[in-house]
Amino acid sequence: MDTYELVVPCHFGLEAVTKREIYDLGYEITRVEDGRVTFAGDAEAICRANIFIRSAERVLLQVGRFRATTFDELFEGIKALPWEDYIPKDGKFWVKKASSIKSKLFSPSDIQSIAKKAMVERLKNVYRLNWFPEDGAPYPVRIFLLKDEVMVTLDTSGDSLHKRGYRLMTSKAPLTETLAAALIMLTPWKKDRILVDPFCGSGTFPIEAAMIAANIAPGMNRQFTAEQWKNLIPKQLWYDTVEEAQDLMDADIQVDIQGYDIDAEVVKAARENAKRAGVDHLIHFQKRAVADLHHPKKYGFVITNPPYGERLEEKEDLPELYTQIGQAYAGLDSWSLYMITSYEDAERYIGRKADKNRKIYNGMIKTYFYQFMGSKPSKRREAAEKTIERKEQQ
């Protein structure tokens, strides 16, 4: 089976999370760059990466890399790539997207047009055709230019991998599923600890946490462009990967995951989303304000995405809101708080400085992932709690 260079775009600042996921799948990392991780893998790896990696935006198959500072060099570089190894005679191929950063060639539309012409020229010569029907499987191409280095890829995923298939209803400021999963995996939260999101919105943090706890693969209930690439990936590999994912699931696990919001309609939407994700039985959703956040359990986790106040009229409410977050957190003995927000004065109104602070881009918005660490349970206490939990489950 052929080995490919597979490129996994991810959120800037969270490459280490994606890298760990790829390692856990058993693959060798070949390159780590800002916002993407590259690894070596075969056709089966394409299936497994799409279905299992939680933090990936998509999985790209690298066709080639070369330098280009003129459109002639771009044309010749793309024409020199072995497109016939990937695209059959009836394949539908087009340049889905082109991006350019700090490069002499900067017009995406021109890059797309020239790249398509170069691909056609190559395939005309190889297949001895003057016209392509393009009525077969789709082969979308994505091209990236960075400092005059061109990376040419085929998109195996299709829709972005944050589209798990469960979120039909969204709140006003939704967090993508891939970012939520990556942030959860960045924390030390484990499934034996309570997790609460007091600003749950459409339920993304609680749902992703429940899927992690139950080991439900994020791509089990969606389709991918490369499923149609019968010339590269046997259909059986997709069936086998889904079967592997089903075997690894533990949907009967006992966890304590809770999501609150002050909007009853939003809470209803979160419940519906959780039901579609198959984890509604693992999450308790409730209409509740952050000021009412309290819990008798110790060593819990608050992981949340509070309002940022991106609109001017909302900014006036932020000092009071973040003061309430700080007061609620102060009453949670031994708990940890993990919070993503773009609000620059978050620490000031929460009333303490974060133990860690990581800059992350949520789309085009620069945000901060504040990490307030609670105390850890002693090993003796942890062992005793697990014994009690096992007895309760019997």
Explain the meaning of each model-derived region.
Residues D2-Y139, K391-Q394:
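Non-catalytic nucleic-acid substrate-recognition regions in nucleic-acid-modifying enzymes
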Residues R48-S55, D159-R164, L168, G374-Q394:
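Flexible, glycine-/basic-rich loop-and-beta segments that form/coincide
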Residues L175-H295, E310-R311, D317:
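Conserved S-adenosyl-L-methionine
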Residues A289-Q394:
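C-terminal catalytic and target-recognition region of SAM-dependent MTase-like enzymes
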